[in-house]
Amino acid sequence: MNCLSRTILFSGLISAFSLGQISPTQVGAANRQPPNVVVIFIDDMGYADIGPFGAKAYPTPHLDRMAREGRKFTDFYVTQAVCSASRAGLLTGCYNVRVGIFGALGPGARHGINASEMTLAEICKQKDYATAIYGKWHLGHHKQFLPMQHGFDDYFG
């Protein structure tokens, strides 16, 4: 997938969030703010493991409220069923093999996400969004592969 296709894909994603957040009375508002976008990406989670998708065993009130007040997507696909590869797919919009991530990257891995790959965070930065990632990165452990080199303003993980 080339950069233009990825830009269109991610612009469409942002637009989908935006359209769901605008009421008819807001359409003409001159000071309309872009929507907040939160992507939650969890390894090995079942469909009904959180409240918005039916979990009853434990409360998830903040996730429930986010789902109620925003957009909730119900169909999910990953490029591969391991952490590093599926993260690479989500962040680049490309198949993991296309971007050189063939499986899970352990602490001894010498490679990671290539600097030439455009990420979702970099596209969001072009639209003046602040970006952050919290939790497991798993796309390379050397400085050139870390989140701050790929469009994220803040990282803890």
Name every feature range the model reports, one short phrase each.
Residues 2-4, 8-157:
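Formylglycine-dependent sulfatase
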